[in-house]
């Protein structure tokens, strides 16, 4: 029986889609959309909402495709990523480059046409920072790759805000700071239970270079900092009681996970904490949105 993979149109499309890391792209776009709605007391113009969502999503996908291209040999050595079409050699380097270029070009054009030049240039800079500075320089060179490189991944709320207002005020940077501080514990938890993967691939992730105990301590410390930072929208007056209540409850659960990881680590616990960290960020930003529109109604 011939078991060779047949590249039907459907399977080929799914391979290209996989290069864009759809789940990560969705979370980035979600945070950008929340930034759009928080930027205005009313509703976001449909043209800006649609154009900003599509444009940011396309440029994000373009950056992730470049990441898959650069890391195809590394991905092939890691169980978590060995399935990727780029790692398996199912899509050529030229095809990935062409795909990324088309996505990036369409994304830039969409943002320029439907939002404003500032959003286009900020988005290009953001995802170049991820695809080039983080992927090529930081990730293979320093265990602080996630901390420094997290700046590019934290930008989506500012991109969304800029799409609506043409500016990036202080409130937008608070949202960026939340994601920036969230990024290290989110990825370090993953790196703990995938330590062998990173070690085999020669990547200097924190558990590989500094050990498990050091990483567990820093997950706890960053989660404490994150809890404090998530109070800033309420303190600054950007958000009210609905958000504050949500941030405290969600943060308390995250802190409980971080404390358990520090005191009594297991891979199973780390997996649950990693999954929760994604749920945490999604619900936190959803709470910002609900509070934004509920606050004038309930007066809190």
Curated annotation (Swiss-Prot):
It is an enzyme of class 2 (transferase). GO terms for biological process: heme O biosynthetic process. Its EC number is 2.5.1.141. It is found in: Cell inner membrane. GO terms for molecular function: protoheme IX farnesyltransferase activity. It is a multi-pass membrane protein. The chain crosses the membrane at residues 24-44, 48-68, 94-114, 118-138, 146-166, 172-192, 217-237, 239-259, 278-298. It catalyses: heme b + (2E,6E)-farnesyl diphosphate + H2O = Fe(II)-heme o + diphosphate. Pathway: Porphyrin-containing compound metabolism; heme O biosynthesis; heme O from protoheme: step 1/1. Keywords: Cell inner membrane, Cell membrane, Heme biosynthesis, Membrane, Transferase, Transmembrane, Transmembrane helix. InterPro entries: Protohaem_IX_farnesylTrfase (IPR006369), UbiA_prenyltransferase (IPR000537), UbiA_prenylTrfase_CS (IPR030470), UbiA_sf (IPR044878). One of its GO terms (cellular component) is plasma membrane. Disulfide bonds: none annotated. CDD domains: PT_UbiA_Cox10. Belongs to the UbiA prenyltransferase family. Protoheme IX farnesyltransferase subfamily. Converts heme B (protoheme IX) to heme O by substitution of the vinyl group on carbon 2 of heme B porphyrin ring with a hydroxyethyl farnesyl side group. PANTHER family: 4-HYDROXYBENZOATE SOLANESYLTRANSFERASE, PROTOHEME IX FARNESYLTRANSFERASE, MITOCHONDRIAL. Carbon 2 of the heme B porphyrin ring is defined according to the Fischer nomenclature. This is Protoheme IX farnesyltransferase. It comes from Burkholderia thailandensis (strain ATCC 700388 / DSM 13276 / CCUG 48851 / CIP 106301 / E264). The gene is ctaB.
């Amino acid at each position: 029986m011939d078991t060779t993979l047949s590249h039907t149109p459907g399977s080929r499309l799914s391979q290209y889609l996989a290069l864009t890391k759809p789940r990560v792209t969705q979370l980035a776009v979600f945070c950008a959309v929340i930034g759009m709605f928080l930027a205005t007391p009313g509703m976001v113009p449909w043209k800006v909402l649609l154009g900003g969502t599509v444009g940011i999503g396309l440029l994000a996908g373009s950056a992730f495709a470049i990441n898959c291209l650069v890391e195809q040999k590394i991905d092939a050595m890691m169980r978590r990523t060995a399935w990727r079409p780029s790692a398996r050699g199912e899509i050529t380097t030229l095809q990935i480059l062409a795909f990324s270029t088309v996505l990036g070009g369409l994304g830039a054009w969409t943002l320029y046409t439907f939002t404003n030049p500032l959003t286009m240039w900020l988005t290009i800079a953001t995802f170049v920072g991820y695809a080039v500075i983080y992927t090529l320089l930081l990730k293979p060179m320093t265990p602080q790759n996630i901390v420094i490189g997290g700046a590019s991944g934290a930008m989506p709320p500012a991109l969304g805000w800029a799409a609506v207002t043409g500016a990036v005020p202080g409130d937008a940077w608070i949202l960026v700071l939340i994601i920036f501080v969230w990024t290290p514990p989110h990825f370090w938890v993953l790196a703990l239970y995938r330590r062998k993967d990173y070690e085999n691939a020669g990547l200097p992730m924190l558990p590989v270079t500094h050990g498990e105990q050091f990483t567990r301590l820093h997950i706890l410390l960053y989660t404490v900092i994150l809890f404090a930072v998530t109070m800033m929208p309420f303190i600054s007056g950007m958000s009210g009681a609905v958000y504050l209540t949500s941030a405290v409850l969600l943060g308390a659960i995250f802190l409980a996970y971080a404390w358990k990881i520090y005191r009594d680590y297991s891979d199973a616990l780390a997996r649950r904490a990693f999954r929760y960290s994604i749920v945490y960020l999604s619900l936190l930003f959803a709470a910002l949105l609900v509070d934004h529109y509920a606050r004038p109604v309930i007066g809190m």
